[in-house]
Design a protein with these regions (language model features):
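Polytopic transmembrane helical bundles with strong interfacial aromatic enrichment
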Residues: 1-131
Length: 131
């Protein structure tokens, strides 16, 4: 019973994280004056920090749901990439080239999040995720 609930929490959180990354891209676009944005990046920054809870729930759901080790590992990788993502802008003053990796890391984060979400959905449907 707990494992089934954990797997459902895992899949829902994974898809919410995918949606959150897409919302983040939109909020970043709203902050760019070149695209007509006037609000700055405050919403992008605040929302970016708030989704840490979702990425942590992905891992918790995988653990409670007794997901395969590979799925747990991918969930940990999401957390690592998330913390890299939130750290990259702080390199702006000392290393702008490193800070410029922020959008590229966001793409990696989105790809991995989709992969984790698809595999999570297969877990709840009873189909073994591909290795």
């Amino acid at each position: 019973m707990a494992a089934t609930l954990g797997r459902w929490i895992h899949v829902v959180a994974a898809w919410l994280f995918v949606l959150a990354i897409i919302v983040q891209a939109y909020l970043a676009g709203q902050g760019l004056p070149q695209l007509g944005g006037t609000s700055g990046f405050e919403a992008h920054i605040a929302f970016g920090y708030s989704i840490v809870l979702v990425v942590l729930v992905i891992l918790i759901g995988a653990l409670v749901g007794r997901a395969p080790r590979s799925q747990v590992g991918l969930s940990v990788a999401l957390i690592v990439l998330y913390f890299v993502q939130t750290s990259l802008p702080y390199a702006k003053a000392s290393s702008p080239a490193i800070a410029a990796l922020h959008p590229a890391n966001a793409m990696l984060l989105l790809i991995l999040a989709i992969y984790v979400a698809v595999r999570a959905r297969r877990l709840v449907s009873g189909v073994a995720p591909a290795a």
